[in-house]
Each structure stands twice: as C-alpha cells, then as structure tokens.
Swiss-Prot record:
GO terms for biological process: viral process. Keywords: Coiled coil. The keyword Coiled coil applies. InterPro entries: Pox_A_type_inc. The lineage of its organism: Viruses, Varidnaviria, Bamfordvirae, Nucleocytoviricota, Pokkesviricetes. It comes from Vaccinia virus (strain Western Reserve) (VACV). This is 27 kDa A-type inclusion protein. The keyword Iron does not apply. Residues 4-210 form a coiled coil.
Length: 227
C-alpha cells in the first residue's frame, strides 16, 4: 500500500528537519567560542525539537492530519531555514575574519623570522670584527713591547758609553795629577766628569721602565688586552 500524500509530506518534512539539524550542529561546532551565536543556535535547536514533536503527533494522527497543519509546519521550516541562513552567514563572516587574522599572524611570524635571521647574521659579522680587533690590538701591544726593548737597548748603550767615557776621563785625570799637570786641565776633567755623571743619572731616571720619548703606545689597545 502506497503512503498517502500527507504521510509522504510528513516524511519529507522530517528528512528536511534532520538535514537542518545536522547543519545547525555543524554550525555550532564551528562557533562554540561565540556566545551570541551559541544562544541563537540553541533557539534554533529548540524550534527543531518543537517541530519534530509536532510531526510525531501528525504521524500518530495519520489521515486526520489537516492540510492546515502541514502548511503550518512548512512555514515553521521556512522560518527555521532563514534563521539557519543567518547563522551560516555569521559563520562565514567569522571564518573570513579568522582567515584575515591568521594571514596577518603568519605575515608577522614571517617578518619576525626574517628579522631573527638578519640579527644572527649581524651577530656573526660583529663577532668576526671583534675577534679581528682583538687580534690587531694584541699585535699592537706586542710591537710596543719590542719598541720598548729597542728604547731600552738604546739607553743601555748610551749609559754604557757614558760610563766608559767617565772611566776614561777619571784615568786621564789621575794621570794628569801624577804627571803634575796644571790645575786648569784637572778642573776641565773634573767638570767633564761631573757633567757626564749628571747625564748618566738623568739617563737612568729616563729609562725607568720605558723612556718618555716613546710616544707610540696605544693605551686603548693595552687596556683592552689587559681586560
């Protein structure tokens, strides 16, 4: 026995309700974080339950179901469909906003990654130049030490030369005295000896560590090497 037209219509309506209910469920899962959307979906869910209850009553009543009742159910479904379209539209707008925000976040991440890469490259370059600067400063200090040795050697030679000259003059002075030389010659020897002794003392003071004439020291380089 074929189902009566009204029974077929009720079945179609029930299938339609099931489909709408499924769509609403999907909409709910995609918008759980939105409180307003959640309330709207709950309202739609309540309507579906009410409509489903009425359809069940129609099924129990069988042929007694009036066309007016079926039309009323159709109207309710249309209203429900419009509400679902609103929900879907809101969902689409939320998804579009999410995609826009996600795109901006990805762009920011990409920019940060590029900045990090440049900073790392810059740090490598800075480290290279710092190492080179330290190496050159060490060279400067070593060269200054060698230069200082040269000054020390120079003044050691000068001191030895003056000491030799003093010894020679003292021998000449002694010989002059033993030979009965004139006071003028002896005074000259004495003055020259005293002068050389003063120069020798000044030379020794000037060569205490390093001579003041050595102006080539790089103080900054020495301080950096010490630290």
């Amino acid at each position: 026995m074929k189902p009566m037209p009204k029974q077929r219509e009720m079945r179609r309506l029930r299938d339609r309700i099931s489909d709408i209910e499924r769509q609403l469920s999907d909409c709910r899962r995609n918008n759980e974080s939105n409180a307003d959307m959640e309330r709207e979906m709950q309202r739609l869910r309540d309507r579906i339950m009410d409509l489903d209850r009425q359809l069940n009553e129609c099924k129990r009543n069988g042929n007694g179901t009036s066309s007016e009742e079926v039309n009323r159910l159709k109207t309710r479904i249309r209203n429900l469909k419009r509400s679902l379209e609103i929900c879907s539209k809101d969902e689409s707008e939320l998804y579009s906003a999410y995609k826009t925000k996600l795109g901006r976040a990805r762009e920011q991440i990409s920019n940060l990654q590029e900045s990090l890469r440049r900073e790392r490259e810059s740090d490598k370059t800075d480290s290279y130049y710092r190492r080179e600067l330290t190496r050159e400063r060490n060279k400067i200090v070593e060269l200054e030490k060698e230069l200082n040795k040269c000054f020390d050697a120079k003044y050691i030679d000068e001191i030895n030369s003056k000491k030799t000259r003093i010894s020679d003059l003292e021998r000449q002075l002694a010989a002059c005295k033993s030979n009965g030389g004139s006071n003028g010659n002896m005074d000259q020897y004495k003055r020259e000896i005293e002068s050389l002794k003063r120069e020798l003392a000044e030379c020794r003071r000037g060569n205490n560590g390093s001579h003041s004439d050595c102006k080539y020291y790089d103080e900054e380089a020495r301080d950096c090497v010490k630290s």
